[in-house]
Structure formats: C-alpha cells, structure tokens
C-alpha cells in the first residue's frame, strides 16, 4: 500500500490546494458494491500515524487549502493523526481544510469543527447518485432515504459516480442538476474497472464526452471530472492514490 502516491498539488482555475491521502483504521461501512478502495487501511493506529505524519510533513501551505482524503471517513483517522493535521495546518497557516466522510458519520462533524476552531472546514460526501433505488439497492451506499437537501445540511461537497452499466444518461443529468443545486462543488468520478463485479459502460461514457453537457461541466469551476482512463480530456487530481485501483467515490 505504501507505494501509492499520497501527496499532490491541484492548481487549476477550478481550485488550488494540496491533497494528502492518509491511512485510517478502515471504512466502518465498507459495503459499497462498486468500491474496493477501502482495502487501504491498517488497524495498527501507531503504524497509521507514522505513515500519515510522513505524508503530512510534505505539506507546505502554498495555497492555504488542504484536502485530506483516506480510504473511508475522517472518523477513522487515529487521534494522533488528527492532532498532527491540526499542528501542520496551524504552522503552515492553512485557512481551509477539506475532509471526507460517510453520511453515517454526519453527527461527528460538529466535533471536528470544535477541534479545528478558527479554521474553515468543508466536508465531502460520496453520495454517488441521488436516485434512491440506484444508490441503495444497487450501489448499497448505506444512506437510507436521505435526500440531497438533507445531506447538504452536513456536507457542502459531493462525489457522483458515473459510467457504470445499469445507469442511464437521464438519471446522471438529474444527479448533476441536484448536485449543483444543493452543493458548493461536485466531483464526477467516471467508473474505472476494479476488483468488484461492476462494469464500466463505455457507450454511456462516450455519450457524455461527446455531449454539450460535458463541455459545459468541464468549464464549470464548481465541477471536477475525473476519469483515470481519459486523463487527457478530463480534470486531474495530481494522481494522488495512483498505483492501485481507485474509483474515486468517497464514503
């Protein structure tokens, strides 16, 4: 796992920030049918901290913004890592920190705001889709009947999963509309084949890339499009997480 790229810098017209991929004790949900990203974890919290500290030592504060991602949610980062993040953020005068989390951990967000008092915190949720049947019966996200409006009360950013067999273009466009209505920023992660049984719908993906919607979204500063198989025409994330399968959907 340690051969992954865990530090990067995003610097384009959409956003400027440093990104770190840390390691936690493991996604507490870990039941999403499309995701094998959760294999990057270790129950040994001291080992996690030692690895995470080395990654965090690379942070310079160049853009005053830091995004912290992991294989699950912020609650699965050990306490020493959280303390070290706070130390680095304070020393580097970083004004905004972005964490990711599963909807099931929404009630812990208020405690993070207390810990990082005086620092602007933003939170990403991997809603993947707002189609209730697709989200719960097919993707098995474990978010119950939560609506985009209720989700946005806790999270100001969302990841959307696109390009898997069984999804329709119409439902995808509805996801985009709802995402832009209720969230500050959305990230469209185009499904990349991994160790799960989910398959990429290349016909659907190409329909998107040949559409006016794609060009409009690519030019929208609130939207990031990531496709590991088409990096030349989509946005980048500085290859953080490179070296093994990562479909991009957060918890």
Where are these regions (language model features)?
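Distinct, well-ordered alpha-helical segments
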Residues: 77-86, 106-116, 170-172
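Short, flexible/disordered intra-domain loops and linkers
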Residues: 44-46, 79-80, 137-139, 169-170, ...
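Short, electropositive alpha-helical surface patch
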Residues: 81-89, 168-188, 237-251
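Canonical Radical SAM [4Fe-4S] cluster-binding loop centered on the CxxxCxxC motif
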Residues: 4-50
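C-terminal accessory extensions appended to soluble enzyme cores
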Residues: 1-9, 90, 192, 199-251
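Core AdoMet radical
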Residues: 37-52, 59-79, 89-107, 120-146, ...
């Amino acid at each position: 796992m340690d051969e992954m790229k865990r530090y990067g810098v995003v610097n384009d017209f959409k956003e400027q920030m440093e990104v770190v991929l840390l390691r936690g004790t493991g996604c507490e949900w870990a039941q999403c049918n499309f995701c094998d990203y959760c294999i990057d974890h270790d129950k040994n919290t001291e080992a996690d901290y030692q690895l995470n500290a080395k990654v965090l030592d690379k942070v310079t504060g160049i853009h005053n913004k830091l995004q912290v991602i992991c294989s699950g949610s912020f609650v699965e980062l050990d306490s020493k890592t959280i303390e070290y993040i706070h130390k680095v953020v304070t020393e580097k005068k970083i004004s905004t920190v972005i964490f990711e989390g599963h909807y099931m951990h929404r009630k812990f967000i208020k405690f993070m705001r207390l810990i990082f008092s005086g620092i602007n915190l933003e939170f990403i949720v991997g809603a993947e889709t707002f189609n209730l049947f697709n989200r719960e019966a097919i993707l098995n996200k474990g978010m119950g009947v939560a609506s985009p409006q209720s989700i946005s009360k806790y999270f100001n950013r969302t990841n959307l999963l696109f390009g898997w067999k069984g999804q329709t273009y119409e439902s995808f466009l509805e996801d985009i509309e709802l995402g832009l209505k209720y969230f500050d920023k959305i990230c469209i992660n185009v499904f990349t084949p991994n160790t799960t049984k989910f398959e990429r719908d290349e016909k659907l993906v190409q329909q998107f890339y040949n559409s006016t919607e794609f060009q409009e979204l690519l030019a929208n500063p609130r939207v990031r499009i990531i496709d590991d198989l088409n990096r030349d025409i989509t946005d980048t994330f500085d290859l953080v997480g490179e070296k093994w399968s990562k479909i991009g959907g957060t918890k």
